[in-house]
Amino acid sequence: MADPASYRPQTGEIPTTPGVYRFRDPHGRVIYVGKAKNLRSRLNSYFANPAGLLPKTHAMVHAASSVEWTVVGSELESLQLEYTWIKEFKPRFNVVFRDDKTYPYLAVTMGEKYPRVQVMRGERRKGTRYFGPYTAGAIRETMDTLLRVFPVRSCSAGVFKRAESSGRPCLLGYIDKCSAPCVGRVTPDEHRGLAEDFCSFMGGEAKRFISRLEKDMAAAVAELDYERAAGLRDDIIALRKVFERNAVVLAEDTDADVFALHEDELEASVQVFHVRGGRVRGQRGWVVEKVEDATTPELIEHLLQQVYGEDSEVQGRIPREVLVPENPSNHAELMEWLGGLRGARVDIRVPQRGDKAALMSTVRENAEQALKLHKTRRAGDITVRSLALQELQEALEIPVPLLRIECFDISHVQGTNVVASMVVVEDGLPKKSDYRKFSITGAAATDDTAAMHDVLTRRFRHYLTDKAAQVPIVSGEIVNPTRAGAKSGTELPPSDLDVPAPKAKFAYPPNLVVVDGGQPQVNAAARALAELGIDDVYVVGLAKRLEEVWLPDSDFPVILPRTSQGLYLLQRIRDEAHRFAITFHRQKRGKAMTVSVLDGVPGLGEAKRKALVAHFGSLKKIKAASVEELTSAKGIGPALAAAVVQHLGSTEDAGERAPAVNMTTGEILES
């Protein structure tokens, strides 16, 4: 741990203007981002009396090795830049609100040519509208009911393509729960209109659709079209059924998001009710570990930044009113920022009495129950992870905490399509965004030890390259993002501050490397690190069958008890690396098995290869075609056709033509 005095900037070097600051660890990784109205006052508070800081702030300043800052023109700019950097760097000492994955969302993929309605969990995707979350039973019942009125596509991409190629819709198309765009019953624009109506209904405009259907039903009755009128009546009943599931909680013209918190010393639970048209249209929850010594107003500020800033298509999701238990810090700037995202005024208020205060109380009760449930579920998990990491550290006699572990595995079939995987575990949990896969060719693919040496060399050579490429950080220097030719220290508008820096893929080294294998693989990995001059990364191997743990240059393995949580953690990491490697190997092997002579034609991509085969019917006919005939295929120009003819001609000339054989007698025929 670093002494804060070793990187403390001189007081006179720190400006007294608003700005955003970053603390970095010895590896250059950003571990905390903060903003301040007065940079000098805020930064001095970290260094004046480190022993008097709260525990987590104390841990942060001792984990850091440098600090830098950016001067901005206003508090609004500092708010925007702080959010941008937290989103880009994901500092481990900042508050991060993590979604409660218990309940699914109803999602509409508006970014696709034919939008699809589906039930989704997990991270949000760009171009997709989300509604909810709901319980699993309620969401499927709602979706099934609404597809009667808004027959939007709900099938997977594979089912859609099969129906498109066969010309026959799936079952939902036959029972009128899908408009069957796959077979051309509706145009893409008509189908998109249905999807937009679906989203509008879920967004709170139910009464408008019901009124429109009632008018259409009355018109059908007037025209004596009773069959159509009966269908419209059933649609109205279906919409009312969905509409009445949501209780009226506020005035019908109220659109608001109601936030409430329940917190203790270590964690905070947040719940929000999305009220549209006076009815609760969805509920969402987060739990945050208070790694930062934040007050409730600061927590609310971070919460609103992350909730409304996480999606670029946020304009339609921000209501006119945001109700919170306490006004956030930087209240006016936050309202201005949200208003800019929405394109209209947004009020952030604390309800004092009436229906809104009563609803806030209900949301707060939900937050309290969610925190109790979260702590019950995580109590055992955190204890077991901590025990496993401690057991490993003690058994392997490693002097540093195992904050990051990387595991490597080699996969192949009889030396073909050799690949390697790298999986990452931080604080005992997998970090899938850092997983990597490697293709291994040449001499390194001859055996497992050579492959292991190759992949470790490549991984840590990348680390050294990324580390060397980082701009040296001078503690206390005023850092401003500048355009080419701009002078250091100049201020830029927020649009320039939002440009993310290029990310280093391998810039953060592990404390421990685990390889799948015994003594040979471990020694190969250790040799690779030694050749690169890396001596602060520990290496072990986990051998199959007996589950022995091998150390470099050791004649005897370390035997961990079968009931050891440390051994169980190693096994899970090894099995995950094995799964990841096998998946990549199968992809590579499958691609190799479907290789075509057309793959080598320069400029001929997959779509044009398919167009050629579809046009001519076989590779034999493509080979026999002239340049002029090839240009008759869709997307094939004269230059590309000439390249195809030249490539196919060269492949025939490259090898001897196989002799013709009489398949009945086995006689070789003369050509």
UniProtKB/Swiss-Prot annotation:
The protein here is known as UvrABC system protein C
Protease among keywords: no
Q: Which Pfam families does the record associate with it?
A: GIY-YIG, HHH_5, UVR, UvrC_RNaseH, UvrC_RNaseH_dom
Q: Name one GO cellular component term.
A: excinuclease repair complex
Q: Which residues belong to any copy of the UVR domain?
A: 207-242
Ranges that cross the membrane: none
Intrachain disulfide bonds: none
Instruction: Report any one BP term from Gene Ontology.
Output: nucleotide-excision repair
Is Aminoacyl-tRNA synthetase found in the keyword set? no
Q: Which InterPro entries match?
A: GIY-YIG_endonuc (IPR000305), GIY-YIG_endonuc_sf (IPR035901), GIY-YIG_UvrC_Cho (IPR047296), Hlx-hairpin-Hlx_DNA-bd_motif (IPR003583), RuvA_2-like (IPR010994), UVR_dom (IPR001943), UVR_dom_sf (IPR036876), UvrABC_protein_C (IPR050066)
Q: How does it assemble?
A: Interacts with UvrB in an incision complex.
Entry coiled-coil feature ranges: none
